[in-house]
């Protein structure tokens, strides 16, 4: 009895401790995911994820201290005397605000009205030199009648409105005619390719260059590029080949990069690089095209604003009396024919080729000759243009038999008035 009584309290305390531990263990385990509570029943995971999880093996996460829930705005005490005040605001005593109460209407009516001067009147009264404006005077009638020929803008004819909305070309600004022409004449000398560069090329010939230019004409028509883009691309090619030796397997890559640069310089929406890779039938990769573009830019020293035959023709067309669209299209056709053959046209400046093309087109369509106004503007006479004019006339005569026909097919379109189908004159009166 004594033994049982001696061990009774200790046993009861030990039993109660075990019971508390079990209860605490159950309380800790009741919020644990059942799948995590039995790790032996988990499915096998991928090796990668298992390695990541093994590296992150740590003890149980420490329990976060219980924080007080943020009270919503409606539960926050307002104007409570027991709200603690920060020490930096304790000494900042401000007078309590008061609520304004409107007076009754009867009291307002009983209050006598007082005439108060405004601040502006006080200031004006202080300065005796300033006088208040007097009463407004009626407007005096006009002594002369208005022009009755002026029409209301709501009754104007649409033709007048359309005429005002026409964009003005840069070349049609008379104040800058001479400056533009002088600048182009100076730049064409600086951007001129070397005449006999093809003789120093070990692996390419003039016929290969002609095939390349013919292909670029087709590319321009396929993507509806400007004619100026084609002229710029050919200029870039000739200037690049004047300084670099190129194998025949890379000649098309040079032409593609030159056309890409010209389209970026001239077009509003140039084709993407992937389009130029596609037109080469994936002969070159995008990386090769971009590398060649970078090389062409370095060789040309980033000087891309080269004067072309097309630019000079645009200026010469302004001297037609009257303007003739067929003459303009034929002159552009002859100018592009000169791009095909490096020999003999590399020895002529673009302004000279453009002048010869314009005279030949004018003579073919209308029978007229090189205008006197252009003689004064350019300084070129028929005697000056005669060598280039004879070469261009021979090219025009042999165009139907030329191996490259893309330019003739292009100018058969009604857009260019089918000028490539016109018969060239047999002789020239020069």
Curated annotation (Swiss-Prot):
Keywords: Acetylation, Cell cycle, Cell division, Cyclin, Cytoplasm, Mitosis, Nucleus, Phosphoprotein, Ubl conjugation. This is Cyclin-A2. InterPro entries: Cyclin, Cyclin-A_N, Cyclin-like_dom, Cyclin-like_sf, Cyclin_A/B-like, Cyclin_C-dom, Cyclin_N, Cyclins_cyclin-box. The modification Phosphoserine is found at residue 5. Belongs to the cyclin family. Cyclin AB subfamily. Gene3D superfamilies: Cyclin-like. Interacts with the CDK1 and CDK2 protein kinases to form serine/threonine kinase holoenzyme complexes. Interacts with CDK1 (hyperphosphorylated form in G1 and underphosphorylated forms in S and G2). Interacts with CDK2; the interaction increases from G1 to G2. Interacts (associated with CDK2 but not with CDK1) with SCAPER; regulates the activity of CCNA2/CDK2 by transiently maintaining CCNA2 in the cytoplasm. Forms a ternary complex with CDK2 and CDKN1B; CDKN1B inhibits the kinase activity of CDK2 through conformational rearrangements. Interacts with INCA1. Polyubiquitinated via 'Lys-11'-linked ubiquitin by the anaphase-promoting complex (APC/C), leading to its degradation by the proteasome. Deubiquitinated and stabilized by USP37 enables entry into S phase. Ubiquitinated during the G1 phase by the SCF(FBXO31) complex, leading to its proteasomal degradation. The lineage of its organism: Eukaryota, Metazoa, Chordata, Craniata, Vertebrata. It comes from the Eukaryota. It comes from Bos taurus. GO terms for molecular function: cyclin-dependent protein serine/threonine kinase regulator activity. The modification N-acetylmethionine is found at residue 1.
């Amino acid at each position: 009895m004594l033994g049982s009584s001696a061990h009774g309290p200790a046993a009861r305390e030990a039993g109660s401790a075990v019971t508390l531990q079990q209860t605490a263990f159950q309380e800790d385990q009741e919020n644990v995911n059942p799948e995590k509570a039995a790790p032996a029943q988990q499915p096998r995971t991928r090796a990668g994820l298992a390695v990541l999880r093994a590296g992150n093996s740590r003890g149980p996460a420490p329990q976060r201290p219980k924080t007080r829930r943020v009270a919503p705005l409606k539960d926050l005490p307002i104007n409570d005397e027991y709200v603690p005040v920060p020490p930096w605001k304790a000494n900042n005593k401000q007078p309590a605000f008061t609520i304004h109460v409107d007076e009754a209407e009867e009291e307002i009516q009983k209050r006598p009205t007082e005439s108060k001067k405004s601040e502006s009147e006080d200031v004006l009264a202080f300065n005796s030199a300033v006088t208040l404006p007097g009463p407004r005077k009626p407007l005096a009638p006009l002594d002369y009648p208005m022009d009755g020929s002026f029409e209301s803008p709501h009754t104007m004819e649409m033709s007048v409105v359309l005429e005002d909305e026409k964009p003005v070309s840069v070349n049609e600004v008379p104040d800058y005619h001479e400056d533009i022409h002088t600048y182009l004449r100076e730049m064409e000398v600086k951007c001129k390719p070397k005449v006999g560069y093809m003789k120093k090329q070990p692996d390419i010939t003039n016929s290969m260059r002609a095939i390349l230019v013919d292909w670029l004409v087709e590319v321009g028509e396929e993507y509806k590029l400007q004619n100026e883009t084609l002229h710029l691309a050919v200029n870039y090619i000739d200037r690049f080949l004047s300084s670099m030796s190129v194998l025949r397997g890379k000649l098309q890559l040079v032409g593609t990069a030159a056309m890409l640069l010209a389209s970026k310089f001239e077009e509003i929406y140039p084709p993407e690089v992937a389009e130029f890779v596609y037109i080469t039938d994936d002969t070159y990769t995008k990386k090769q095209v971009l590398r060649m573009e970078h090389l062409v830019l370095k060789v040309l020293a980033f000087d891309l604003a080269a004067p072309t035959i097309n630019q000079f023709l645009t200026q010469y067309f302004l001297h037609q009396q009257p303007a003739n669209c067929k003459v303009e299209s034929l002159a552009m056709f002859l100018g592009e024919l000169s791009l095909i053959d490096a020999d003999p046209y590399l020895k002529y400046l673009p302004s000279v080729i453009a002048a010869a093309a314009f005279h030949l087109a004018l003579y073919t369509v209308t029978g007229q000759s090189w205008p006197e106004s252009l003689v004064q503007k350019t300084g070129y006479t028929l005697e000056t243009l005669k060598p280039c004019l004879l070469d261009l006339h021979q090219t025009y005569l042999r165009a139907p038999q030329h191996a490259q026909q893309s330019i003739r097919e292009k100018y058969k379109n009604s857009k260019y008035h089918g000028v490539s189908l016109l018969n060239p004159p047999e002789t020239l009166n020069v």
